[in-house]
Amino acid sequence: MRSTKVIHIVGCHAEGEVGDVIVGGVAPPPGETVWEQSRFIANDETLRNFVLNEPRGGVFRHVNLLVPPKDPRAQMGFIIMEPADTPPMSGSNSICVSTVLLDSGIIAMQEPVTHMVLEAPGGIIEVEAECRNGKAERISVRNVPSFADRLDAPLDVTGLGTIMVDTVYGGDSFVIVDAAQIGMKIEPGQARELAEIGVKITKAANEQLGFRHPERDWRHISFCQITEPVTREGDVLTGVNTVAIRPAKLDRSPTGTGCSARMAVLHAKGQMKAGERFIGKSVLGTEFHCRLDKVLELGGKPAISPIISGRAWVTGTSQLMLDPSDPFPHGYRLSDTWPRDE
């Protein structure tokens, strides 16, 4: 067996969404900060293509690269690679990374609770892991500051007419639309249609509304979050959502950055206040338990500090290799399973 490279991976999913973790075989990319390192990964694309494209990956897969932290407060850094983006932050991926770090012994587990500080490209995140019998059973992550950008903005979408949307940042950038406006329900049988419509809405929002982070070089809207109405029971709000990820797939989890974004919009509209909780439910029925911890300011904008809580499970280990005679060193994409991102 011969190979010009061997990449060691621990497989993982958080509430249904794949978030595999590279634990060896890749040197840290160049960059003075984790953000700069993530920009190198995004622009170079060599590693992204190798691990995400067929025959080694697929549109369903997200992969995280562990890197030494740049911030002295952090114990580990990580860079997130999604099908079309290399984002600042991801809730499900941070839960996967935390679980792999503890379950594999890379960071020592303390029962019943382990506290960690990790460094995502978008900033420092604080992690609290509930642990028992050698397993990280639930991960709570303090996400980066989240804020609403545009509220109730009109958006013209081909085939849908004019719809009203919100744009918001929850660790990544979203356009949010109510499912009823587009004549859809969030259920597994409509996954393909939801994904395709969501990508179309994202494209229209980038063309007509745009987005710019006040502190990061992040100048586009990444995702469309499709929501159903929120219900309230005391100080707990519950809402079903699904996020369309380019090129056209649905997040299987409730989307941690999406839940953070939704809480930011609810707060901006006066429908949620500090200390209240939000349960986000996915298209699979899995849940993230979240809290609007406090209100703050980011770059002159009102913002919130959200906490996301969910579970993840290790699914296996693997080694990705490249035989020198392989005709597809960068992999390939076919539109039968990798929809065209138009």
Curated annotation (Swiss-Prot):
Tree of life domain: Bacteria
Disulfide cross-links: none
InterPro entries recorded: Pro_racemase_fam
Family of this protein: Belongs to the proline racemase family.
Protein's name according to its UniProt entry: Uncharacterized protein BCAN_A0346
Organism, scientific name: Brucella canis (strain ATCC 23365 / NCTC 10854 / RM-666)
One example GO MF annotation: 4-hydroxyproline epimerase activity
Pfam families, sorted: Pro_racemase
